[in-house]
Amino acid sequence: MGEPYLLTPGPLTTAFSVKDAMLRDWGSWDGDFRGMTAELRRELLAIAGDESGQYDCVPMQGSGSFSVEAMLGSFIPRDGKVLVLMNGAYGQRIAQTLKYLGRAHVSIDKGDYMPPRGSEVAAALDADPAITHVVVVHCETSSGILNPLKEISEAVYSRGRKLLVDSMSAFGAVPAGVGDFRYEAIVSSANKCIEGVPGFGFVIARKSELEAAKDRSHSLSLDVHAQWAYMNKTGQWRFTPPTHVVAAFLEALRLHRKEGGVAGRGARYANNRDVMVAGMRQLGFETLLGDEWLSPIIVTFFSPAHPNFKFERFYELMKARGFIIYPGKLTVVDSFRIGCIGQMDSHVMQKVVAAAAESLAKMRVDTATPPALALAERARLAA
C-alpha cells in the first residue's frame, strides 16, 4: 500500500516533489544556499503580508518548540511579566518554558474545551498593571481549538501591552498576517501548514522588537537577535543549517503559492475536516468541540464507551489500513485526534472514515457513542 498517510498536525504527509528536493546536497556557506535562505525569508514575509517592511523573518534550527522558546527568551525582558492564555498542552508548555527562563507569569486556564475570550484578557490586564506581554497559542492542537486571535489582540493593545503568538499549526492555512491582527512576533515551523519537513522553525517579528532583543536571550543558540543580525550581515545561519530541509521547504512554498496561498490551503483543509467529521459522526463518534470552535487543522474525538474499544488496538487497525492517527492529550476523558492537514484531499478523508468503520467492526464495536460522562463534561464546561 506504500507509506501511510500521517493524520497528525505535523510532521505530516508531504508531496513527492518536496521529498525529491532533498536528494541534492548543499554547502551551507555557498552563495546558492545563501540565496535559498534569503528566498525563504522573503516568501514567509509575503505570506505574513508585511507590505510596510516593519517586520523581518528569522529562521531558527530545531523543532517548533525551539522557536517558541527563542521568541520568549528574546522578546520578553527579564523584568517583564507574562499572561499566558492556556486551553491545552501547548499553552501549558509555554508556561513551563517561562518557568525555565525565570520570567514572571500568570495564566488564564480554560481547560480542554473552551477558548480564552477578549473580555477575559481585558479583565486580567486591568487587574494586573505589571503584565507586559500576553502569549497565546493560535491553534491549540491538543484539542483542536482555533483561538479568537483578533479579539484577544484588540484587548491586549487597547491596554498598551504586547502580544506574542505561537502559530505553529495555523500559519499558512489560517489568516495570521500582520494585517489580520496585531502582534509583535509570531512563530511557526517548516513541517506544519506549509507542508515541508521537520528541521527548522521561524520567527516573524517587528524589526523594532528584534533590535531591542540584543543581549537579552538566555541562550547562545536560541538568540533571535543574534541570528537575525548575523543573517543580515552574512546571509548565513550562525550554526549548521538543515540544508536539505530548506531545499524541501522552498518546494513546499512553491506548492503553497500554486494552491492559492493561505486561502487556498485553508479551504482544502476545511473541506477535509468537514468530510471527515460528517463521516465519523455517522459512525457515532462525537467531537470534543462544538462546530464553531473546530479548527481546519486537527479534530479531537471522544473515545467510544463500548467495552471492546481499546485505542491501542484501534490505532494498529487504522495503521494497517494506511492511516496514522494521534492519541489524545485531554486531561479529563479518553480521546484521540485526526489531523486534516498535509497532502490529502476529501477523497482521502472518505477513506479514513471507511477505515474507521472497518476497524470498529474488527473490534466488534457496534457503536462509537462516547460515555455519558464525556458528553456531560463537555456540556458543563461549554455552558
UniProtKB/Swiss-Prot annotation:
GO MF, one example: 2-aminoethylphosphonate-pyruvate transaminase activity
An example Gene Ontology biological process: organic phosphonate catabolic process
Cofactor(s) required, per the database record: pyridoxal 5'-phosphate
Residues recorded with modification N6-(pyridoxal phosphate)lysine: K192
DNA-binding listed as a keyword: no
Key words of the record: Aminotransferase, Plasmid, Pyridoxal phosphate, Pyruvate, Transferase
The family this protein is said to belong to: Belongs to the class-V pyridoxal-phosphate-dependent aminotransferase family. PhnW subfamily.
Quaternary structure, from the entry: Homodimer.
UniProt protein name: 2-aminoethylphosphonate--pyruvate transaminase
Source organism per UniProt: Rhizobium meliloti (strain 1021)
Gene symbol of the encoding locus: phnW
